Each structure stands twice: as C-alpha cells, then as structure tokens.
Regions:
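A charged, aromatic-enriched C-terminal amphipathic alpha-helix characteristic of glycosyltransferases
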Residues: 344-345, 358-386
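A short, active-site helix/loop in glycosyltransferases that binds the activated sugar's phosphate group
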Residues: 160-190, 197-199, 330-331
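N-terminal subdomain of nucleotide-sugar transferases
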Residues: 1-57, 102, 194, 232-239
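Nucleotide-activated donor-binding/catalytic signature segment of Leloir-type glycosyltransferases, i.e.
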Residues: 256-284, 289
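Short beta-strand->alpha-helix junction loop in the catalytic core
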Residues: 137-138, 173-174, 190-203, 220, ...
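Membrane-proximal helix-turn-helix segments that form the acceptor-binding/catalytic region
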Residues: 94-103, 116, 120-124, 132, ...
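Acidic donor-binding loop of glycosyltransferase active sites
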Residues: 284-303, 318
Length: 387
C-alpha cells in the first residue's frame, strides 16, 4: 500500500461493498468519504443518496443527499436530471471536504460518469489522483431508443475517463475492447483486478441429504439477470426432485414481475428484499446452488462484467449455474465450481442441477477453493499503488 491517507469513493447503491471493496478501502485509508448514489429504487432501503464519513474504519457522520424518487418506468428518461444533481453534490461536498481536510489523496470510482467528475475535481485542485476501476461496458444497442441514447452518452464519458491517473479493469475483455477501438495502443499494459472474494468459514453440509433443493440468488432484480430460469423449469424440477425452494435476496425494477411469477409457481419462494450489512450470508449459506444465468442478449451489459454475486457464492462454497456470456464462465467450468449452460437449451438447466446435486460435496469444495484465488486482500493492493 502507498502513503495515501484520504480517499473519496463513489459508487452506486447497492454495490458499494461488492467484492469487499469498501472493506478494503476502510482497512487501508485513514479518512474515507463514501458517496452512495441511488439508481434503482430498492425495497427495504430508505436512503439512496448518502455521504458517509469514516475515520480509522469508524463511521463518524452521514449526510443525506438530495433524493429524487423515480418510478422504474422513468429511470432512464430522467438520468440527465439525476446526473446533474449527482455532479453538483459530489463537486460541492468534495470541495467542502478539501477545505476541512486540506488534502484529499485519491478519488476512486467504478463508473465512467463519476470518474469524469473526478477528473474535474483534480483539474480544480480538490484531489491529487484519480483511479477508475472499470466494471462494465454498456453496448449502445437496445430495443428502447432512450436507453440506447443514454448508453451512447455514457460511452463518451467512458472514453474520457479511460485516461484517469490509474485505470484497472475487472477482466481482460474490457481492456481488449478499448484497444480494438483505438482508445489504447495494442501494447498498452493496464492491471486486471477482478471482483474480490471474502474469506469465510467453510461450513458445507451435504445438500444431497436434504429433501429440498434450495436455489439462491443475490443481486438487483432485473430480467436480464436470468432470475426466472428456476420458474421456467419448475415442472421438470419438481418432477425430478420433489421439493424445490428459492431464496431471493435483493430488489430492483422487475421485482413485482418476479413476485407474480413466484405466485404462479409451486416452488417455495422467499423474497428478502435488500438486506443491510452481510446478513445475506446467513440466507445464502443454506442454498445448494447459486443462480447467475444471465440472458445472452447482445444488449446485456453482463457480457463485459465480473458479477459480484458469483464471487459471493464461491466464498460460501456454493456451486454456480451460469451462462456462457461471462469471461469468468471458463474458469468456473475448468475448476469444477459449477456448470455453464446454454440459456436457450430447454434441458440444460435441469441437467445442470442433476449434475451438481449428484456430486454436490465435490462441486462445493471446488467453489470454495476457487474463491481463495480471488481473496480481496491479495488482489486489490495493485489497484491503489502508483508507480
């Protein structure tokens, strides 16, 4: 780690501690100023826009920032208004913090728009260095023209922010994309820093001895996440295993849709909504299989991501069923930590469940072993070290 003492960290809720990144920052910086920005309306979460001030890992004070409640139907339409508000609040409070603290060493974010705000703060002398940890790429392709326009505009910020003082990528696919379109030279070297895993006790219980097969999902409830694949295969699953449960942790724009699907299904489904802290671990560790079956649509941003949900499943020794749209899918399959399926193959999901449940202990141990490779304390230091 370097000698930096203070950091501004900006992220969208509920991703502030994905891969234990907030924990790492709190462990390594004396003064931490976290801007949590709301994008989706999440049930069970009252405040979306918050500035949290930490000193020596302890929360000192929180400030509620301006909150614009928006129906899920109008999220993308009103992005410009929300973005202007976000811009003004980060600029104002960061400048105020600079006056109080005299020096702010690092501005760190995972979003292209907020990374651009960081470059402005550096230009006016508020912060010393900027770090952009690139989590995603939003293909400017979508059936909704408004969404397509917003993605195009976001991509312009992404190209600018790709020249922050420090740029790291969660996978090589994101870096190669920028090389292919000429943002970087072909021989440019940038660190690949995946989403990290936690080091949790391994408490595997052989799920084959349980009569109920329990699936788990954690994340934002959007149709693109493939949450409904369990409902789509309910009849076959019930015929094969007799009793099926589904634990769903999280909230999001399509939550009502999934709740309706659950009502029409004979599967026992429990929605937990957004859970504070890490209480979701207690829910997930009961589950036999983690769901990460992203729909392979060309407009799905998950093609370029490194989903934190998968790293969470692995940290708990939970085998994963995922689709082959992630770069990380190859590693899941090679390590025997789960099964990768073709989303549109009608038999693939049930066959994958059979395969995992037939050797659940083995798959579970492989998942936990893979998680050790990505322990967050091992992989994050290179992102914050300036040479």
């Amino acid at each position: 780690m370097n000698s930096a003492k203070s950091i501004i960290y900006v992220n969208y809720s509920p991703y502030e501690n994905s891969g234990k990144i907030l924990d790492y920052i709190l462990e390594n910086f004396e003064n931490v100023f976290l801007f949590s920005i709301g994008f989706y309306n999440l049930r069970n979460k009252r405040n979306y826009n918050i500035l949290s001030i930490y000193k020596d890992r302890k929360l000192q004070k929180t400030y509620s920032l301006f909150q614009l409640p928006i129906s899920s139907k109008f999220v993308f339409l009103l992005i410009p208004i929300k973005s202007v508000i976000t811009f003004l609040e980060i600029i104002f409070y960061s400048t105020w913090l600079k006056v109080k603290l005299k020096r702010i060493d690092i501005y760190f974010t995972v979003n292209a728009f907020t990374a651009w705000i960081g470059s402005i703060l550096k230009a006016i002398g508020v912060i010393e260095k900027t770090i952009f940890w690139v989590w995603d790429y939003y293909p400017p392709i979508h059936e909704n023209k408004i969404v397509m326009l917003m993605r195009y505009i976001y991509w312009q910020f992404d190209k600018i922010s790709s020249h922050s003082d420090r740029v790291a990528f969660v996978n090589r696919r994101l870096l190669d994309l920028r090389k292919d379109i000429g943002i970087f030279q072909k021989d440019a070297q940038y660190p690949i820093v995946p989403i990290g895993t936690d080091k949790l006790p391994y408490t595997h219980v052989d799920k084959k001895s349980n009569k109920k097969v329990l699936f788990g999902f954690i994340g934002v409830l959007k149709k693109s996440q493939g949450v409904e694949i369990v409902f789509d295969n309910a009849d076959e699953l019930l015929k094969e295993f007799g009793d099926i449960g589904y634990e769903i942790v999280g909230s999001g724009p399509d939550e009502d849709y999934f709740r309706e699907r659950a009502k029409m299904s004979d599967i026992h489904v429990k929605f937990y909504g957004y859970l504070e802290g890490e209480s979701f671990n207690d829910v997930l560790r009961k589950c036999a299989i983690g769901i990460a079956t992203y729909i392979p649509d060309v407009s799905n941003v998950s093609h370029y991501g490194d989903p934190g949900k998968i790293k969470r499943y692995l940290s708990l020794g939970i085998p994963v069923i995922a689709t082959n749209i992630l770069e990380f899918s190859n590693e899941i399959e090679k390590s025997g930590a789960g099964v990768i399926i073709d989303y549109y193959n009608p038999n693939a999901f049930v066959n994958a469940v059979k395969k995992i449940m037939g050797k659940h202990s083995e798959y579970s141990k492989n998942a936990y072993a893979l998680s050790k490779k990505y322990y967050y304390k091992k992989i994050y230091p290179r992102m914050f070290t300036f040479t």
